[in-house]
Structures are given as structure tokens and as C-alpha cells.
Curated annotation (Swiss-Prot):
One of its GO terms (biological process) is filamentous growth of a population of unicellular organisms in response to pH. Residues 160-488 bind DNA. GO terms for cellular component: chromatin; nuclear chromosome; nucleus. Coiled coil: none annotated. Disruption phenotype: Abolishes the induction of CDR1 expression in the presence of miconazole and increases susceptibilities to antifungal agents. Severely reduces conventional biofilm formation but increases pheromone-stimulated biofilm formation. Compromises expression of SUN41 and CHT3 genes, leading to a defect in cell separation and growth as chains of cells. Impairs virulence in a mouse model of systemic candidiasis. This is Transcription factor NDT80. PROSITE patterns: NDT80. Induction: Induced during biofilm formation. It is found in: Nucleus. GO terms for molecular function: DNA-binding transcription activator activity; DNA-binding transcription factor activity; sequence-specific DNA binding. Residues 73-87, 103-145, 153-172, 292-301 have a biased composition (Low complexity).
Length: 504
């Protein structure tokens, strides 16, 4: 064999691995280009992915193109590949030099990343340069596993936090709308006129104050009348303990009277009288009239009333009546009451009536509450037995002749006599002006008066004030409850104005 032939054969043998390696690299480059063209998203997809997931590497977007939910797993796989790559590079370092780019599990894998920019330039999509890529993926090997675990945990926590934040924001938005609707509803909500929520027991009244004495005709013994009254609607206690009402609101008051040591049977079996020193018409009787002062028994020295009522006129009481009046603490201010009809329209308005009444106990608050606005005839009849005395039924029950009756019952003007005076749908004609400078001590009071109805010489009825009770000071406001931020009541509705936060 020729020596040169041996040399050529040796050269052929020496170059054969390099030719095979170049052929293998060419195939790998061709497959990588095809693989990159298939796996690389178009510019619109890359832009969308970068906007949605800016924290991902550009290679992660390739995986996101086909499997959007696998980018956390891909990061873990990349870290495993980096560890394997370092081992292979250490083993084959004397054969194949390692490029600065990211290495794969085989020595030929670095050529993939070297050839990636060429197909990407075909799409004209901007990609990060290899230098930042190498900087991003060349941390210290000792800290690499902890960063990978931390990044994975941060990605998972970020997704959970984003989902929870969106759900919480949606829930808070719904709660805000619901609270706003509740505030608007509460600020505009009105209680129905017949609603039981309007009824609440008002302030207590004082003890009875007697203005004129009352005597029994048969014994000339003094009789002590006792008044009872209660406000069942329209007033409530404010935050400072004052009793507050509103001019536009109705209030309801019930009143009755009793005679001490006199039951009802004893009452209707007697007559009563009093003395009058004010009514000039009564004192103007002619000398022959029984009511003239010289014909009065109390003017005789032996009469038990001589020392107290000498010179006064003794007048018989035809019947008793109950009246409701309002007064102001300022005597120069006139205040009155009006009563509305049950139709709640701008119909006729009258002053509260004077109720002829017989002695009776005051019903409780629940009875008054139930008795309002009844429409059932049976229930109305039941309530009438509580609030009224029927004189005609009484005569029939005891077989009495109304013409021969000499009791006080005969003097009452009608068959139906009130046992309890019900003052319903009552309003004040004026209110207390809060902005006035002299209103600090101004207030209103309600007075329930027991009247003795007498007749003068012209047979005209005249009232004589026998006894009275009064309420504690009442504040009557002219505007809605929400207009008064101090001393609030239950009708107060807070405005939407936010309260300033105190400085820290």
C-alpha cells in the first residue's frame, strides 16, 4: 500500500466524525427552524401574552401559546434542564465548548437557542437580546432552587390573590349598592298613618289640682275629683330626656276622671254642686230666685260652708265634662289645638271638643292602640262599651223611667256619654322656633281639665273649672326629625354626608 494512501485513509477517518457532526447539526437546525415556526406565536399573540403575563420569560410565551395553564410547570422543567445541562457540560466540556446561552440536556441543544433569532426575525417580532437573557438565567447556583420555589409560590399566590381580590371587589360593590339603597329607602320611608309603630306612651301627667270644691247635695260633704290622662301617640323622649313632638304629626290623648270614695252606682244616685264667685251672670239672679246669695244656705252662720263660701253663689252641677287645652310657657304666646277628620284631607278643622263624661277608669295603652281605626262593626261595638256609657240601655236594664229620673244622668245632653274622652288626630297650630334667641326656656304644655257645667238665669250652660292636670314641658318642632341633629328622636335619618375623620 502506498504511504499516501494510508495517510489519506487516516485523514478520512479523522474527518469522518466532524462530517457526521456537521450533518447532524444541519438536520437539527432544520428541525429547530420548523419547530420554531410552529411553536412561535404571531406578533399579535405575543403582544397579548406579554400584556397579560409580563412576569413570564419570552420562552414561556411559547408554551402559553398551546398550554396557557402550564407556565408554572414549565419553569420547574427549565430548572431541571439547567441542572442536567450543567452535568453534561462538565462531562463533554473537553469535546464541545459551551456557548454563553442557555444549555439543554444534550450537547447539541445550545444550537437551538443560537438559531432562534433567525426565524423570529422573519416575524419581525422584537425579542430580548441574549445578554439580558444570560443575565436573567445566570444567578448563583446555590440560590437557584430557592428562587425557583419562591417564584412558583409567588405565581400561585398572585393568581389566588387576584381572584380573591376581584371577588372581594365585586362583593363590596354589591354591598355598597345595597347599603345605598337601604339608606335611600330609610330616608324616604314613611310609616303608614294606621301603623302601630306610631303608638308609644308619652310623658306622665301631674297629680290633680283642684280649682273649685265639689260637694254632694245629700250630705254637703266635699267630693275629691281625680283626673287621669295619657298620651298614646305623638310624643317621645329625646336624647337629653326632653319630650319632643312634631307639629305635622297627630297625637292621641285619652282622659277620664273618678270621684274619690264614689263608685259608679253611688255617683248616679247623687247630685253635686259647687260655688261660683267669678260668673257674674250667676250672681245676677233676682232676690226671689233660689240662687240669689240671700237664699243660699251657706250664708247662714250654722252652715258648715259658711266660713269658706259666705257671699258666694251655690250652683248645681248639671253634668261633668272633660276639656283639652294647650298653653305656652310664654304668656304672650297664644297656642291652640285643632282636630282633623278621619279622611286625612284638607277638610274641616275644629278645636278639640268638650266631652260630657261620667266617672270611669282609664283603659290601658294596648286597648287604645287596638281601638283606633276599627272598621268591623262587632269590634266597634265592643270598644264602645269600654269608652261610652249608654244611658238608654241602662234605663232598660233596670226598668227605670227616664222622665222620673232625678239623678245626674238625666242632665247629660245625649244618651251616649263618654266614659273615656278620646282626643284623636290632634295637632298644634304652631311650633317652637328653634332659631329664636329667647326660646331656651320656651315650651308647651297640655292641660286636661274637669269642668262642671252649670246653667245661668238664661238657661245657658257655663263651664266652671273644677280640677286639672298638666303634662311636663313639651317641645313641638316645626320641621322633620332629620333636621334636628341635637336631641334626636326615632324619626331621625342620617344624611349621606361623610363625617370628617379626627386627626391622628
Amino acid at each position: 500500500m502506498h504511504p499516501s494512501a494510508g495517510v489519506n485513509n487516516n485523514q478520512h477517518l479523522n474527518h469522518q466524525p466532524y462530517q457526521q457532526m456537521s450533518h447532524y447539526n444541519a438536520q437539527q437546525m432544520h428541525q429547530q427552524q420548523l419547530h420554531h415556526q410552529l411553536m412561535t406565536p404571531n406578533p399579535y399573540q405575543q403582544h397579548f401574552q406579554q400584556q397579560m403575563h409580563p412576569q413570564l420569560h419570552h420562552e414561556d410565551h411559547l408554551n402559553m401559546h398551546f398550554n396557557p395553564m402550564s407556565y408554572p410547570q414549565q419553569q420547574q422543567q427549565q430548572q431541571q434542564q439547567q441542572q442536567q445541562q450543567q452535568q453534561h457540560l462538565h462531562h463533554f466540556g473537553h469535546q464541545i465548548p459551551a456557548p454563553p446561552a442557555q444549555q439543554g440536556p444534550t450537547p447539541q441543544q445550545p444550537h437551538l437557542h443560537q438559531q432562534i433569532p433567525h426565524p423570529l426575525s422573519h416575524h419581525q417580532t422584537p425579542q430580548p437580546t441574549p445578554q439580558p437573557l444570560a443575565q436573567q438565567q445566570s444567578p448563583q447556583p446555590a440560590r437557584q432552587p430557592r428562587q425557583t420555589k419562591k417564584q412558583k409560590q409567588q405565581a400561585q399566590n398572585q393568581d389566588q390573590a387576584d381572584a380573591q381580590s376581584q371577588a372581594q371587589q365585586h362583593h363590596m360593590a354589591m354591598m355598597a349598592r345595597a347599603n345605598q339603597n337601604d339608606m335611600l329607602e330609610s330616608s324616604t320611608r314613611k310609616v303608614a298613618p294606621r301603623s302601630s309603630d306610631l303608638f308609644r306612651v308619652g310623658p306622665p301627667f301631674s297629680i290633680s289640682k283642684q280649682h273649685q270644691p265639689v260637694y254632694c247635695v245629700g250630705t254637703d260633704m266635699p267630693v275629691t275629683p281625680l283626673l287621669h290622662a295619657r298620651i298614646d301617640r305623638g310624643f317621645e323622649m329625646g336624647e337629653t330626656g326632653s319630650w319632643i313632638g312634631y307639629k305635622r304629626n297627630y297625637f292621641t290623648l285619652v282622659a277620664s276622671f273618678t270621684l274619690q270614695d264614689f263608685d259608679f252606682e253611688k255617683f248616679i244616685g247623687n247630685k253635686f254642686y259647687t260655688y261660683d264667685k267669678v260668673n257674674n251672670k250667676v250672681n245676677g239672679f233676682p232676690p226671689h230666685h233660689p240662687s240669689h246669695p240671700q237664699n243660699q244656705p251657706q250664708n247662714h252662720p250654722g252652715h258648715p260652708h259658711h266660713n269658706q263660701h259666705a257671699g258666694e253663689s251655690r250652683v248645681p252641677i248639671s253634668y261633668f265634662a272633660i276639656r283639652l287645652v294647650a298653653k305656652c310657657s310664654d304668656e304672650d304666646v297664644a297656642i291652640s289645638l285643632i282636630q282633623h277628620t278621619a279622611k286625612r284631607d284638607k277638610g274641616p278643622q275644629f278645636p278639640p271638643p268638650i266631652y260630657p263624661a261620667v266617672p270611669s277608669e282609664l283603659p290601658d295603652h294596648e286597648t287604645v292602640k287596638v281601638s283606633c281605626n276599627k272598621r268591623n262593626n262587632n269590634k266597634i261595638e265592643t270598644m264602645n262599651k269600654i269608652f261610652y256609657f249608654d244611658r238608654g240601655n241602662y234605663y232598660q236594664e233596670y226598668n227605670l223611667d227616664s222622665y222620673k229620673d232625678q239623678s245626674i244622668l238625666k242632665s247629660y245632653p245625649s244618651q251616649s256619654i263618654s266614659k273615656v274622652a278620646r282626643f284623636e288626630r290632634i295637632q298644634f297650630t304652631s311650633s317652637i322656633r328653634v332659631k329664636s334667641t329667647n326660646t331656651t326656656a320656651r315650651y308647651f304644655t297640655l292641660h286636661v281639665e274637669l269642668l262642671g257645667i252649670i246653667e245661668d238665669e238664661d238657661l245657658q250652660i257655663q263651664p266652671i273649672l273644677l280640677s286639672s292636670i298638666e303634662s311636663p314641658p313639651l317641645i313641638v318642632r316645626g320641621r322633620s326629625p332629620s333636621s334636628y341633629h341635637k336631641d334626636r328622636t326615632s324619626g331621625y335619618r342620617a344624611t349621606n354626608t361623610p363625617t370628617p375623620t379626627p386627626p391622628q
